Amino acid sequence: ALTISVEGWDRRGAFCPLLRQISLQPDRLLECRAMTYQVLARKWRPKNFASLVGQEHVVQALSNALDKQRLHHAYLFTGTRGVGKTTLARIVAKALNCETGVTATPCGECSACKQIDAGRFVDLLELDAASNTGIDNMREVIDNAQYAPTAGRFKAYIIDEVHMLSKSAFNAMLKTLEEPPEYLKFVLATTDPQKVPVTVLSRC
């Protein structure tokens, strides 16, 4: 849903703004071939730590952890909307699964990096807690956690707006947060950390 591609003939010029003037002529047809439109925020989203702006202390801490192989099983990213929490989480997923090895400088060229950038990496799960608040949604996530990664080195679970989860969903997640498999990393993101239970905060 991020990209709209338009192919074929367009008599009205609805998707060809530069050619609308010509399209108004009834005796001519316009051909719009593979015109792709993408939201600028998506197009220019940072894809590595070096391209992030304004998060120096966070980047330094994560880079050190990756380079020294001192990785926690769960991270909590907090901040207002649009500061880059989900973007940073995806970069962490790339750093963990880059085919060159666990690194603070993922190559961006290997199959794993490209699939994560495209949102198609099988071992990266992104859950919008605002839309999936219930225990049934969380049970599906936890049930999947028992299986080893299919394509990557680690499974990465990114749970956005985690404070929106129900109390029962938080309780279902606690056991896995306490004793996660070695191959599983949680990245929780929230705009309202005060609403996240203390039992969850203490495990991040």
Q: Which role fits each region the language model picked out?
A:
Residues E7-R203:
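P-loop/Walker A NTP-binding region and its immediately flanking N-terminal helices
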